[in-house]
Structure formats: C-alpha cells, structure tokens
C-alpha cells in the first residue's frame, strides 16, 4: 500500500507546479499618537504606503485613490480636524463630514471619514486626525482602501487606529 501511494505521488508530482507565495498589501503605519501642547486635543498620524506600485498585475498594486476610516460615534462627535500631507511638513485640511462613501457602497454602509487623496507610486501619504478627547488604540480599527481605476475594488484593512476613550 505504501509503495502504491509513493508511486502515485512520484508519478503525479511532475504535474504539480509550486508557485512561490506572494502577498501584495498596502501598509498602514501608525506614526504617532500625541496630545497637543495644551493637552486639550489628541492627534493621530498614519502613513499609507504602496510597497509594490504598478498596474495591479503580477503582484503589483495600483495607486490608492482614497482612504476611508470608520470611527465610533464618540470619536465622530469628538473629531476636530483631518488633514493629509505628502511630506509631513505641509498639511492640507479635509472635510470632517462623516458620510457614506458611494465608491465603496458594496463594502460597507457605515459612515466614514474619507480622505479623498491616496498614494503616488511608492511614496507614503500621511494622514492626521485630531480629537478633543483622548482615545486608546484599537489594533483592529477598520478602514477601506479604494484604488485608482477601481481594478482591485475596495479593500478592507485593519490597522492600529482610534479605539475607546480613556477619560470616561
């Protein structure tokens, strides 16, 4: 019996092609979580990076067109500002309107904070949000990444983001 199984494996192993596993995923890195100088606000900063830019073929990733964050109702109510930057020096303010994003309607019906700017090649884009209260880190905070051209659809990404409050 063992000889039969061995012969079968040897015979058909020539038909099996082993493909090296590759994982292409955008990287969301927590840069900082800090209180401002007066201690009245907490600021969160993340970097979103495309580690393998391309057209979406052969393990490459298309540029991100926008990044949408889901926030708890308390975080939504405490949101003071949202900004993005390509260099962490010049920051551009964005609307803090929480709303449904029609471009990811097949992924979620939740209201999200939409940063309508994404990545450019392999360079990081930085995102910053400010709250008027302090929050803990949720290592499984939810976000949605939409790619340019929509080829890879909308992608659910978990990241180290805004969690529960620390001062209730």
Outline where the language-model segments fall:
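Extracellular or exported targeting regions of proteins
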Residues: 16-168
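Sec-dependent, cleavable N-terminal signal peptides
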Residues: 1-21
């Amino acid at each position: 019996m063992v000889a039969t199984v061995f012969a079968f494996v040897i015979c058909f192993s020539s038909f099996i092609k082993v493909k090296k596993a590759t994982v292409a995923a955008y990287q969301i890195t927590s840069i900082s979580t800090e209180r401002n100088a007066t201690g009245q606000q907490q600021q969160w900063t993340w970097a979103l990076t495309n580690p393998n830019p391309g057209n979406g073929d052969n393990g490459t990733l298309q540029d991100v067109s926008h990044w949408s964050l889901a926030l708890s109702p308390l975080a939504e109510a405490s949101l003071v500002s949202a900004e993005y930057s390509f260099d962490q020096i010049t920051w551009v303010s964005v609307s803090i309107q929480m709303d449904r994003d029609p471009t990811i309607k097949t992924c979620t019906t939740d209201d999200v904070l939409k940063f309508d700017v994404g990545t450019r090649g392999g360079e990081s884009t930085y995102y910053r949000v400010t709250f008027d209260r302090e929050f803990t880190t949720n290592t499984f905070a939810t976000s949605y990444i939409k790619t340019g051209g929509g080829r890879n659809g909308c992608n659910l990404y978990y990241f180290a983001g805004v969690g529960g409050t620390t001062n209730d």
